[in-house]
C-alpha cells in the first residue's frame, strides 16, 4: 500500500513535474517549517531556484507559508511547510478544474458544426471549412460533415461521473 507521503509526492510530480520534488521531499523529511534559505542550503542550490519551486508548489496547494518580519533587517522571512493533510482538497480542486475544462469543451462541441477530411481525419470548424472552400488544408480533399454526437455523449458521461465524484467527496470530506 502506498503511504500518504509517496502519494503526495507522486501527485505533485504528475501536476508539476520532477523539478519541484527535491524541495517537497526536504520539507516532508524535516517535518517542521523551513525557510527558503534553509532548503537552499540543504539542497545546495540557489535560493531563487528554491523560491520558484516553492511558489509553484504553493499555487497548487502542496505547501503553505507564514511570514514574519526580521527585526534587524526589516525583511520578510517565509517559513514553509508541506500541506500533506490537504491532499484530498488538492485532488478535489484538480477534479473541479478538469470538470470546468470538460464543460467548456462540451459547449464548444454543441455550439459548432464540424467537417472532417476523409483522408487524414483533420477536423475543421464550419468557419475554417468555409474559408478553405470545404477543402482539406493538408491534402486538398473534399471535407465531409462530422457528426459530434459521440463526442458530446462521451463528454456528458464524463461530466456526470466527475460531478458525482466531486459531490461524494465533498460530502465525505466536508469541503
Curated annotation (Swiss-Prot):
It holds the Pfam family TFIIE_alpha. It comes from the Archaea. Residues 4-88 form the HTH TFE/IIEalpha-type domain. Gene3D superfamilies: Winged helix-like DNA-binding domain superfamily/Winged helix DNA-binding domain (1.10.10.10). GO terms for molecular function: DNA binding. Keywords: DNA-binding, Transcription, Transcription regulation. The keyword Hydrolase does not apply. Transcription factor that plays a role in the activation of archaeal genes transcribed by RNA polymerase. Facilitates transcription initiation by enhancing TATA-box recognition by TATA-box-binding protein (Tbp), and transcription factor B (Tfb) and RNA polymerase recruitment. Not absolutely required for transcription in vitro, but particularly important in cases where Tbp or Tfb function is not optimal. It dynamically alters the nucleic acid-binding properties of RNA polymerases by stabilizing the initiation complex and destabilizing elongation complexes. Monomer. Interaction with RNA polymerase subunits RpoF and RpoE is necessary for Tfe stimulatory transcription activity. Able to interact with Tbp and RNA polymerase in the absence of DNA promoter. Interacts both with the preinitiation and elongation complexes. This is Transcription factor E. The gene is tfe.
